[in-house]
Structure formats: structure tokens, C-alpha cells
Amino acid sequence: MIIEIEGIKLKLHPEVYEPAEDSILLLKNLVDVKNKDVLEIGVGTGLISIACAKKGAKKIVGVDINPYAVKLAKENAKLNNVNISFFESDLFENVTGKFDVILFNPPYLPTSEDEKIDSYLNFAFDGGKDGREILDRFIYELPNYLKKGGVVQILQSSLTGEKETINKLKPLGFKVEISARLKVPFEELMVINAWRL
């Protein structure tokens, strides 16, 4: 089955996170990526990376821990006639170089051991016990991969505390703002923009 979001055609896969309100909020609030080197962590279907290609990004690297997502994102890039380098990586593990823009829609649901699902989809939701496990690892490693003057965009849920994210970014030398908000049942979604000073 092929769906279309904002003019981007996407094949779906049962083991890959299907774009939802969080993906769309990030998509509609992307920073200017024209002529920029872009890295997306956790590409899923490839929607955001493909949008960056259509908006004129110079180079795009997209990674995901889920091999089904990497394969699907490659197929979707082909479907939309764009050139993107997709490969498997646990966050920055297999990434080299520095980027102007880094994008991340992390798994943010607080998940106990008995709530985990036996599927690659678990990677898309499971944020650890407090929902911050993956996000905090990402923030800690982020300065090694973002150029000075570069920007990171993080999709944040009120479930995992935007203040905590902001308070972790600032001491690392980031100027932080919330650029978009969306109330959905049980939570508020936000896009956090943080510039490396």
C-alpha cells in the first residue's frame, strides 16, 4: 500500500513506525535545509529525510536501528526520485562527520519491561522506564556531530519533560527554543530547536 503525505509517496511496512501527528509536526516545522548537510536519526519510512531532499539539502544521511526501516526508507527515496544515504546505526554509532542540521523524533514512551513488544516496532516507541533513555544518550553525543552554528530539531513529548531536555542542552552550549506545539490526547507534542553556539 502507498500513502501520500505532503506530496511525498510512502510505502509502509508492519515492522516500521507509520508517520503520525509527531512526524507531521516535525515535517511542517523543518528548519531551512537548503544547501545544508543533514543527518536524521531514526528515519522510519524516510518521510523527513525525503522532505529535506525535496527542500534542497546538499547531503542527507539517514540512520535507523531497525533494518526494516532502512530498507523501506531506501525504497521510498527511490519512489520519490531523491538520493539519500540510509544505513543501520544505533543513534550515532556508525555515523561519521559533522552536520549543519540534525533531526530526531525519538522513542519517548515510558516503557517498563513487561510493556515491551517483541518486534522491531518496539524501537520506535520504547524510551526506557522514564521515556528519556534514548533521548538523553542522543543529547550527550550530539555535540560531536553538529557543526558550530548548526541546529538540532527534536520532537519532544510532554510525557518526558521538555524542561529537562532544554536544561540538558543549555550547558552543552546550545541556544534553545520551542518552535511548535500540538495538543493530542494525553500529551502535548513539541518541536525543540537548539542552535550550537
Curated annotation (Swiss-Prot):
Keyword Methyltransferase: yes
Catalyzed reactions per annotation: L-glutaminyl-[protein] + S-adenosyl-L-methionine = N(5)-methyl-L-glutaminyl-[protein] + S-adenosyl-L-homocysteine + H(+)
Record keywords: Methyltransferase, S-adenosyl-L-methionine, Transferase
Top-level enzyme category: transferase
Record EC number: 2.1.1.-
Keyword Transferase (UniProt): yes
Positions that bind S-adenosyl-L-methionine: 42-46, 64, 105
Superkingdom classification of source: Archaea
Any GO BP: methylation
Ligand binding (substrate): 105-108
GO molecular function: nucleic acid binding; protein methyltransferase activity; S-adenosylmethionine-dependent methyltransferase activity
Signal peptide: none
Pfam family, one: MTS
Gene Ontology CC, one term: eRF1 methyltransferase complex
UniProt family annotation: Belongs to the eukaryotic/archaeal PrmC-related family.
Role: Putative protein methyltransferase using S-adenosyl-L-methionine as the methyl donor. May methylate a Gln residue in target proteins.
Protein name per its UniProtKB record: Putative protein N5-glutamine methyltransferase MJ0928
Organism expressing this protein natively: Methanocaldococcus jannaschii (strain ATCC 43067 / DSM 2661 / JAL-1 / JCM 10045 / NBRC 100440)
Organism lineage string: Archaea, Methanobacteriati, Methanobacteriota, Methanomada group, Methanococci
